[in-house]
Amino acid sequence: MKIYETENYEEMSRKAANILSAQVILKPDCVLGLATGSTPIGTYDKLVEWYEKGDLDFLEVKTVNLDEYRGLTRDNDQSYYYFMHEHLFDRVNIDPENTNVPNGTEPDADKECERYEKLIESMGGVDIQLLGLGHNGHIGFNEPDSAFAQTTHCVDLTESTIEANKRFFASADDVPRQAYTMGIGTIMRAKKILLIVNGEAKADIVAKAFFGPVTPEVPASILQLHNDVVIVGDKAALSKIPR
């Protein structure tokens, strides 16, 4: 496990974008595993900036996203499909046919999970998987006590997640109750994992996940057993790790 400490969010984003862009340059048809949320936005902005300067070419790049809400249409501005197009896909020259996000409107959840898992396998697996880190150590929608061997699956969202999401929707009834997520087993099969984290609020869980015991109670702790993990965090997020 390699840990890079940065001064701030901007520097963290630049470092993460450097690692992703190196993968694209070394293997133009690479498979990138991508994440959503506020943390990777700066990373995507950097990739777009370098694409606009002519330093990066996404024409052959393939992507698979970590998760998606079940029940949201792709034109819903809270869907992760929408997020990815807004922050990256529509801003670079990636082929839309090469971008993959779980289909939130597929009525058969088991069918969609099986399709997505087989899709990842058919692409030869993920070359580098970008991850954020939840306050309780979750990665994707793999909450505490998720099975480490689990593949892509549909999860019931926790009440705290549903409550936190209410502010993004017009009505509480519109808030998704389920989501598709790559399982921890799927994530662990990525050839390389890049986890980005920032802010003092994440300091405790960073120390617990990466310097505490490997346990399903802290899903991200399993990453200690992966043979190629890079953590990029700002000073605040890394302030409680052993020195």
What are these regions (language model features)?
Residues 4, 72-78, 82-86, 90-243:
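Conserved phosphate- and dinucleotide-binding cores of soluble alpha/beta proteins
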